[in-house]
Amino acid sequence: MVVMARVPRSERPDLVFEEEDLPYEEEIMRNQFSVKCWLRYIEFKQGAPKPRLNQLYERALKLLPCSYKLWYRYLKARRAQVKHRCVTDPAYEDVNNCHERAFVFMHKMPRLWLDYCQFLMDQGRVTHTRRTFDRALRALPITQHSRIWPLYLRFLRSHPLPETAVRGYRRFLKLSPESAEEYIEYLKSSDRLDEAAQRLATVVNDERFVSKAGKSNYQLWHELCDLISQNPDKVQSLNVDAIIRGGLTRFTDQLGKLWCSLADYYIRSGHFEKARDVYEEAIRTVMTVRDFTQVFDSYAQFEESMIAAKMETASELGREEEDDVDLELRLARFEQLISRRPLLLNSVLLRQNPHHVHEWHKRVALHQGRPREIINTYTEAVQTVDPFKATGKPHTLWVAFAKFYEDNGQLDDARVILEKATKVNFKQVDDLASVWCQCGELELRHENYDEALKLLRKATALPARRAEYFDGSEPVQNRVYKSLKVWSMLADLEESLGTFQSTKAVYDRILDLRIATPQIVINYAMFLEEHKYFEESFKAYERGISLFKWPNVSDIWSTYLTKFISRYGGRKLERARDLFEQALDGCPPKYAKTLYLLYAQLEEEWGLARHAMAVYDRATRAVEPAQQYDMFNIYIKRAAEIYGVTHTRGIYQKAIEVLSDEHAREMCLRFADMECKLGEIDRARAIYSFCSQICDPRTTGAFWQTWKDFEVRHGNEDTIREMLRIRRSVQATYNTQVNFMASQMLKVSGSATGTVSDLAPGQSGMDDMKLLEQRAEQLAAEAERDQPPRAQSKIFFVRSDASREELAELAQQANPEEIQLGEDEDEDEMDLEPNEVRLEQQSVPAAVFGSLKED
């Protein structure tokens, strides 16, 4: 049922509503200014025809024109109604008018402005849209402009209207200067490169600018260089040369790229000679090999392209004489550039470190065959290199400079160079000493022997003011008189060219200055010996010994004692003994062996045998533990040769007490073997018994086999039983040594059982003992497997009153002629004894073996 509402004529057209609308109408009449009531009514009428719904919105907005909710829903609904219509449809204009009416009251609402602007953009009405954006910016407070500009900029970029976009971006940058990169990118895309370069230069010079894209200042600078260098015809408002050169001083780690950009700018501008000047300036100023490589490669590519362009032009237009000359000039210039590369690279390295001696030598080698350049290079090098900052030996430059003059026959110039070198304040005395030695060698090469001696004597002359060799506060000229290098050369020359007295004076002076080495002392003594001054040579040794301590004095003592013995033999035996005692006093164990052997040899040849034995005995105590075994072997050998093998018994006993278990075991075997050869079977057996205490049957099977063979040859059943008893006792002893088992576990056990060190850091105490216990059980099982099968005999109790004669008689009855040997340790129980009492055999409890209680 349709009801016609009665309203005044002024409110026509008449409102038509249905019966279902009456409750909402009544509610509105009661609360006509309630937004919620109108929204409930509108929600109810969502399915009604669009005109009815629009009419309802209009009624509500007439009463509530400042309601944002109503306007927002109304405008959204009106836009949705025309969404699929053509933009030329008059309905679009109605919707636009609705928006305009809304902004009379809602001009401070950015959401409505954004929706309206987007709606206009969809219609394609550029001017109307632009003006609406401007109205929105004017209407809204500046704090809300950031909501409008993104859509505004998108609108500006969507149309090919660069002037409009530029004006809009300029306004936007006043609000958001940090978005300059976006504007620059737009300018590049619209080919307005001049303004883009200006903006980019402004950004680069602004230290407070922070790139939204995360670019560094250098990256922005590099973009600017690429932009202005690659577009010289479009960038007119900036001084490109000044900008790039400013970057050269600002970004010193990227000089290569900046120089190439500057040259590229001139190349694209057509100023080829200017570009070539830039390249030449660059390769003479860059400081790193990387920058040099970039500039040089770009320079070479430029020259190649110029040659290729010239050849192409000549081939198209025909060759002329001028073209040929120009082409040859370009080719010659390119070849010269390539040939200069090593020298230019060397210049770069020298600019990095002008005090690098090796690089100066390489530079001289690059000028090979050009004497004038070599002289200039050497002159520049010796003037540039500071000896206190030099890398390498600075004196080699002076020496090589003089050698160059010498090789070219200019000896006077070479002498002048070396003379100047002797006045240079080097950092090290060795440098000046090397120069003086080169002065002497120069004269020797040209057979000016007297002049060479004169120069070296001058070098070693005492200065007016004495100084210590390592006193850095004194110039090296005052310290060179203590240089062993100069004195050694002077001593060699004096030996070859001088007199005996002059040579002796030189060596004495070296010893007085306390700069001699053991070799110098030995050379001096040998020199005196060659001239038959034996006592003087011994005095030289004595002076050398007073200068040095062990171990440096070792060679002097060895040579001195050898020479003394060869000279006097046994004629001055007491003096020789005193010398040996003096040498051995304070001698480290490492060097004692040689001296003791030499001392013992002296006593054997010229002294007393008992003295020699005493020396050997002292030697066994004085040498290092690692050398004691060898020393005992020598001692035993010499004692056997001098006194006989019986005299070595005491030596063997002492060696067994002193040496380690391994060496003591070998000594015991040799000792026992000697006693066997002497027929002392009981002594040999006692030695085997003593040695068995340090021989684990599991690891020293060779010893037990040797003892077994010995008993087979020389023993009887009782001795065999005793050996087996000792073996069981020793094995039981080793089985109860926990520390030994741990070491054996580390050596012998494989990965199956693991080691104590394999336990986790948190596992300790009982876990360690469990692991050792497992290993002990495994070793016991292995020993059980290694034993031969036991005889099926029973355990008997033997009466204690049975005499030894009865036992022996029974043994003979069982086996009258043969001794039964077996591998089993318990075979001695197989023979039945008289008056035996049969006992029942039971298993031994596991607790007897002493294993730890398990958790």
Curated annotation (Swiss-Prot):
InterPro entries: HAT (IPR003107), HAT_Syf1-like_N (IPR055433), HAT_Syf1_central (IPR056350), HAT_Syf1_CNRKL1_C (IPR055430), Syf1-like (IPR045075), TPR-like_helical_dom_sf (IPR011990), TPR_rpt (IPR019734)
Cited SUPFAM superfamilies: TPR-like (SSF48452)
Domain of life assignment: Eukaryota
Phosphoserine: modified positions: S851
Modified residues annotated as N6-acetyllysine in this record: K420
Gene Ontology terms: biological process: blastocyst development; cerebral cortex development; DNA-templated transcription; mRNA splicing, via spliceosome; transcription-coupled nucleotide-excision repair
Disruption-associated phenotype: Complete embryonic lethality before 13.5 dpc. Already at 3.5 dpc, the number of homozygous mutant embryos is lower than expected.
Subcellular compartments: Nucleus
Region (Disordered): 808-855
Assigned GO CC terms: nucleoplasm; nucleus; U2-type catalytic step 2 spliceosome
HAT repeat placement: 15-47, 48-80, 90-122, 124-158, 160-192, 198-230, 235-268, 270-305, 369-407, 498-530, 532-566, 571-605, 643-677, 679-713
Keyword vocabulary terms for this entry: Acetylation, DNA damage, DNA repair, mRNA processing, mRNA splicing, Nucleus, Phosphoprotein, Repeat, Spliceosome, Transcription
Family annotation (Pfam families): HAT_Syf1_CNRKL1_C (PF23231), HAT_Syf1_CNRKL1_N (PF23233), HAT_Syf1_M (PF23220)
Compositionally biased spans, kind Acidic residues: 820-834
Primary role: Involved in pre-mRNA splicing as component of the spliceosome. Involved in transcription-coupled repair (TCR), transcription and pre-mRNA splicing.
Subunit structure and binding partners: Associates with RNA polymerase II, the TCR-specific proteins CKN1/CSA and ERCC6/CSB, and XPA. Identified in the spliceosome C complex. Component of the XAB2 complex, a multimeric protein complex composed of XAB2, PRPF19, AQR, ZNF830, ISY1, and PPIE. Identified in a pentameric intron-binding (IB) complex composed of AQR, XAB2, ISY1, ZNF830 and PPIE that is incorporated into the spliceosome as a preassembled complex. The IB complex does not contain PRPF19.
Listed name of the protein: Pre-mRNA-splicing factor SYF1
Originating species: Mus musculus
Annotated gene: Xab2
